């Protein structure tokens, strides 16, 4: 599979997984296992480790990395013959006379000064670009109405219309309870430093004409 194919497949999967923890919603299934193995292979442990390491860095950190280090392979047959570094011992003696001609206290050229300033600016910009890892949580909660006359779909639309920094609305569904009454089950993702449990409860219960109570079913750190 080419890099182009991987990018295309990744884009399709991003659309399927948007607002979800798994392909089926809140619980993993055999479909998730099959897709995972199709993408990475069932026994590619080194690839798993690489993906895990890569996802531990932010996009800004990855962009700040330099070029890859080139490593030249050395065969066992040629290794013993490479004794050339020992000849470097004569270099200091040869350079002794040349050192006298070098101005150790000479001023840097304009090119050297400009290069140094550019490097300092690049390092400063790289540090500014680094971001701390943002702690997030996925929360699944139930919203129970007063009775069966409450339009839960309309309530879900009202909730999703609420925009708040650090809050992402995911999938929702209507689950039968009893006697024709249903409850709204909603999945969200929050940034822990921006949205607290009290904030969430206050938001849901503010729709007091429709909402009788809310209960958190699952709370998982991402």
Curated annotation (Swiss-Prot):
Q: Which domain of life is it from?
A: Eukaryota
The cysteines joined by S-S bonds are none
- Please provide, in alphabetical order, the Gene Ontology terms of the cellular component aspect for this entry: cytosol; eukaryotic translation elongation factor 1 complex
Q: Where is the composition biased (Low complexity)?
A: 75-94
UniProt entry keywords in alphabetical sequence: Elongation factor, Protein biosynthesis
Q: Name one GO molecular function term.
A: guanyl-nucleotide exchange factor activity
- Please give the residue ranges the record annotates as the region Disordered: 75-98
Family matches, as Gene3D superfamilies: 3.30.70.60
Partners and quaternary state?
EF-1 is composed of 4 subunits: alpha, beta, delta, and gamma.
Q: Which family does it belong to?
A: Belongs to the EF-1-beta/EF-1-delta family.
Q: What does this protein do?
A: EF-1-beta and EF-1-delta stimulate the exchange of GDP bound to EF-1-alpha to GTP.
**Could you identify this protein by its name?**
25 kDa elongation factor 1-beta
Which organism is this protein's natural source?
Trypanosoma cruzi
Taxonomic path: Eukaryota, Discoba, Euglenozoa, Kinetoplastea, Metakinetoplastina
